[in-house]
Amino acid sequence: MEYSDFELVRGIKNGDSGALDILVRRWYPRIYGYIFKLIAHEQDAYDLTQDVFVAMMQNIQSYYPWKKFDSWLFTIAHNKCMDFFRMRKRSVPTDDIVFDHPDPAPLLEETVTISVSVKDALAKLPTPQREAIILHYFHHFTVKEIARLTNTPLPTIKSRLSTAKKTLSKYLREDF
């Protein structure tokens, strides 16, 4: 039987460690992927993902069922990433960003070239624009949800997405 996030959170609040295990297994890959795409360092992404789930447990009593669980959890992840950037005050290295690709053997050379170009273009974006693109196109959040979870005005998110798309288009035109 598949439990909803709401049912699992209710179980966690009642001390059910099995519910916690299911919820972490369900959300760990998406949270790790989001963080890794933002900070581009495997060990830091692993550590921050662990921090997100620790913070989730510490704050689970403050989660209200009328909130979307994924928005609440991604807000925690966003805040952990912003704390990381503030503490480290470093830029994201473009050479370390990795995107999952299927087995490259059947891929045509042209497809590989395009994928690498998109990865490189995305890595050149400023962090706020890259984050908006990742949340919207990789994790399928709406513009309104992105604004809420990043605590950013809706017009700013729209602007970031628009600017990022134009910039990505420019970078990709230069490559081809």
Regions found by a protein language model. Give the residues of each.
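Short, Lys/Arg-enriched C-terminal cap helix and immediately downstream tail that follows
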Residues: I35, L125, R130, S162-F176
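Internal acidic/polar
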Residues: E2-D5, S91-S115, L122, T142
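A short pre-motif secondary-structure segment
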Residues: A132-H136
